[in-house]
């Protein structure tokens, strides 16, 4: 099921949440709406679902204009950040709920519902928890059950609003990998909202970067990271450093891993003072002070990098951005 979003505008009082949003989502694609709080990503997701009405513009599902259809007629599955499971129902009953609530003339038989629930519980790898209650599950298990409940009605589109936001970091990583594999298995057009750059980069086929109600860039994870369309995109997708080029108004941007260090003076390198050294597993992060520049430079190097040998706070070391070979002295 493809999605076409055409000229969508939405305003709340004096606040313009969405400004002329245009986006095409291909059938079977997994797309991330990524951006800071207040950028409009959740509002856009709710408009796609039919939970919110735009002030102007159209939502097209597979060639059909559904702009005037409410959420019940759009056949979308929606997964919220906070699970929204019924506490008084078992896992089995929570998953079965959507089918049991269908009108009698289109409701599957009891045996068909049971079969479908078992299929979905197997799909989310929790078939052994059917008789448990939500309070007996971990956060990650609850979110999988919420996803199974959304999928059991066979939606044409799956929408997820920060589905892993309420989980701890380790569980989020595990569920990201699982969701990516699940999407490959079911091949369902899916859109998810996140403010987590790593989550979007790891899971999505394409990323839609949003800021202040507009789309800054659309592309694959590699495209938006390696070829950012704006300074906002560059900074939002990871840690970055900024330097002014000597005797010009040019500013260069580079990431912490795009730094070369040397204990010996070399052409193109500048002396910097080490302000902080932080081991981060396989990497070591350094904060470096260059001349009179107020912003510290962040550098990341392998923990066995020769430049780290015996290095301490307050030492002077040589530094340059790897990507720039011209004279950028300050």
UniProtKB/Swiss-Prot annotation:
It holds the Pfam family ABC_tran. Keywords: ATP-binding, Cell inner membrane, Cell membrane, Membrane, Nucleotide-binding, Sulfate transport, Translocase, Transport. Its main location: membrane. It is found in: Cell inner membrane. Its EC number is 7.3.2.3. It catalyses: sulfate(out) + ATP + H2O = sulfate(in) + ADP + phosphate + H(+); thiosulfate(out) + ATP + H2O = thiosulfate(in) + ADP + phosphate + H(+). Residues 3-237 form the ABC transporter domain. NCBIfam families: 3a0106s01. The complex is composed of two ATP-binding proteins (CysA), two transmembrane proteins (CysT and CysW) and a solute-binding protein (CysP). Part of the ABC transporter complex CysAWTP involved in sulfate/thiosulfate import. Responsible for energy coupling to the transport system. This is Sulfate/thiosulfate import ATP-binding protein CysA. It comes from Pectobacterium atrosepticum (strain SCRI 1043 / ATCC BAA-672).
């Amino acid at each position: 099921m493809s999605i076409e979003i055409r000229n969508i505008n939405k305003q709340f009082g004096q606040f313009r949440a969405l400004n002329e949003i245009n986006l095409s989502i291909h059938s079977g694609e997994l797309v991330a709406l990524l951006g800071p709080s207040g950028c409009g990503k959740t509002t856009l997701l709710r408009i796609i679902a039919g939970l919110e009405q735009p002030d102007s513009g159209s939502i097209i599902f597979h060639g059909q204009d559904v702009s005037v259809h409410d959420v019940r007629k759009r056949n979308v599955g929606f997964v919220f950040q906070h699970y929204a499971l019924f506490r008084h129902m078992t896992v089995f009953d929570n998953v079965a709920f959507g089918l049991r609530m269908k009108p009698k003339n289109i409701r599957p038989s009891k045996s068909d519902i049971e079969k479908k629930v078992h299929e979905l519980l197997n799909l989310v790898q929790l078939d052994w928890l059917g008789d448990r209650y939500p309070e007996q599950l971990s956060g990650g298990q609850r979110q999988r059950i919420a996803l199974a409940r959304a999928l059991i009605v066979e939606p044409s589109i799956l929408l997820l609003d920060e589905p892993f936001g309420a989980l701890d970091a380790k569980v989020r990583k595990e569920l990201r990998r699982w969701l990516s594999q699940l999407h490959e298995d079911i091949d369902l057009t899916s859109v998810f909202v996140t403010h987590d750059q790593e989550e979007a980069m790891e899971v999505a086929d394409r990323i839609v970067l949003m800021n202040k109600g507009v789309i800054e860039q659309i592309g694959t994870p590699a495209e938006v990271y390696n070829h950012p369309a704006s300074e906002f995109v560059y900074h939002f997708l990871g840690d970055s450093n900024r330097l002014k080029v000597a005797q010009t108004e040019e500013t260069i941007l580079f990431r912490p891993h795009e730094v070369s260090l040397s204990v010996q003076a070399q052409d193109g390198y500048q002396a910097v003072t080490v302000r902080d050294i932080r081991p981060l597993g396989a990497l070591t992060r350094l904060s470096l002070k260059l001349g009179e520049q107020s912003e510290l430079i962040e550098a990341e190097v392998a923990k066995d990098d020769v430049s780290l040998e015996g290095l301490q706070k307050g030492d002077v070391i040589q530094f340059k951005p790897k990507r720039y070979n011209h004279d950028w002295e300050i």
